Design a protein with these regions (language model features):
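Sec-dependent N-terminal signal peptides
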Residues: 4-13
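N-terminal accessory segment at the very beginning of proteins
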Residues: 19-215
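C-terminal segment of classical bacterial N-terminal signal peptides
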Residues: 13-19
């Protein structure tokens, strides 16, 4: 059984809806360096894709186009899981594409949209239309495509159903005793999700985050 893991470094929240927002600009150019490819948008934001392995992608969205960390990761010990060789970007009129033996990564230029497929062209992950990355004042939101038969498992010690679909959870520790069977947040945040399409997401983010799986 093959699994694909996508790692996220972003100031964001996953949602299905929101109020008035500004979407990101269109993708205009890119640079590549070793394992990483950085795509630049015409609103000064940027998104960086780093191939940790042939089936693992680190996705880092930066609203200001800067990719500087204040501290080393508290969770990821080693990003480079295996040799991926030289990363090549195939530029087409409407998109950029990156291929590995296991993945096809597509970056649509206008509107900006990120999609990841397996080697059989089955869609594993996709931004929702042109709303993949949204700014709403100080809030940053991420909208992803939710399929009718998609289910989510994980997030560690959380209340509620084993299948997280239809629920919303906060990633913000709260050491509250005597909690109920449906209370959230709790004392620990483990932002790792296993998805029924045989892929997984790890969200590395120190900001207060809400994961919303409502249909």
């Amino acid at each position: 059984m093959k699994k694909y893991i996508f790692l996220f470094f972003a100031v964001c929240a996953f949602s299905v809806y929101a109020n008035a927002q500004n979407r990101t600009g269109d993708c205009t150019s890119y640079t590549s360096d070793d394992r990483s490819v950085t795509f630049y948008l015409n609103d000064s934001s940027a998104i960086q894709l780093r191939l940790c392995s042939q089936s693992t992608v680190r996705i880092w969205f930066s609203p200001d186009g800067s990719f500087q960390r204040n501290n080393p990761s508290f969770a990821v010990v080693n990003e480079d899981l295996e040799d991926v060789g030289t990363v090549h970007v195939d530029e087409q009129n409407a998109c950029y594409e990156i291929f590995t033996p296991k993945l096809r990564i597509r970056v649509n230029k206008s509107p900006f949209n990120l999609q990841i497929f397996d080697k059989y062209q089955k869609l594993l992950f996709s931004d929702y239309a042109d709303k993949g990355h949204i700014s709403n004042g100080q809030r940053k939101l991420e909208y992803k495509t939710l399929r009718r038969d998609e289910h989510f498992f994980g997030l560690g010690e959380k209340t509620g159903k084993l299948d997280r679909r239809g629920e919303a959870y906060k990633m913000w520790n709260s050491d509250k005793p005597c909690y109920s069977a449906v209370e959230d947040p709790l004392y620990k945040s483990i932002p790792f999700l296993m998805i029924s399409y045989l892929n997984a997401i790890f969200l590395e983010n120190t900001y207060k985050t809400e994961l919303n799986f409502l249909t």
